[in-house]
Design a protein with these regions (language model features):
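Sec-dependent, cleavable N-terminal signal peptides
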Residues: 1-38
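Signature of Gram-negative chaperone-usher
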Residues: 30-214
Length: 214
């Protein structure tokens, strides 16, 4: 009987030891398994640059002007930008004194209307309805997709309500667009001269510039 209990005790101890070994191995395997898959994150950032571009194809020529009978033409500037706050369109003449000079004598000019000043009259600008002679321009309501200012350029495009100004000698803002995308701005020119204006071909250029809004 004693021998029986000795044998049983040995078997029990062996079983306990075996169980402990199995538990230990299982614990190691669990630990190994829990460490076999782990995660971490990486942060990806990129700054997309603001891009902006403007194209202003040449307008059609004024043609032949008879003094006292005004002529008009229109240039359309197309601006493309991804800047979420949009852009400003600015314009200037490229001649120091007047926009249009006689091609054979640069000292003979066509008078410009009073140069546009967007800051005049507490920001209302200084464009005025048409009268008399000279070269004037304005942003047109028709053909301008966004940003048209009736305060600056008149309530509509009719001659009674449309406001004109002369091209400035330095860049000045003529349109403010507040969103991204592709937009057109129609810029109208109107010209008349007095009867005493020297006959001949007059030429000149205006430059448009777009700048992304902050």
């Amino acid at each position: 009987l004693k021998e029986f209990f000795r044998t049983k005790t040995k078997i029990t101890r062996s079983a306990i030891i075996a169980s402990l070994v199995v538990v230990a191995i299982f614990g190691v395997l669990q630990a190994m398994e829990s460490k076999s898959a782990t995660t971490d994150q990486v942060n990806l950032t990129v700054d997309v640059a603001s891009v902006i571009d403007v194209t202003c194809p040449d307008p059609s020529a004024f043609g032949t002007l008879t003094p006292g009978t005004a002529v008009t033409t229109t240039a359309t500037c197309t601006t493309t930008t991804n800047n979420s706050t949009g852009y400003i369109l600015q314009a200037k003449r490229d001649d120091a004194d007047t926009t249009l000079d006689l091609s054979t004598d640069a000292t003979t000019n066509i008078t410009d209307k009073t140069a546009w000043d967007s800051t005049a009259n507490t920001g209302d600008g200084n464009a005025a309805t048409w009268s008399g002679t000279g070269l004037g321009f304005r942003v047109m309501q028709t053909g301008t997709d966004s940003g048209y200012s009736s305060t600056w350029w008149g309530s509509d495009d009719t001659l009674t309500n449309a406001k004109f100004a002369g091209l400035p000698s330095a860049y000045d803002t003529i349109l403010d667009v507040s969103s991204a995308g592709e937009t057109d701005a129609a810029v109208g020119f109107r010209l008349d001269v007095p009867a005493a204006q020297t006959a001949g071909t007059y030429t000149g250029t205006a430059t448009f510039q777009v700048t992304a809004n902050p």
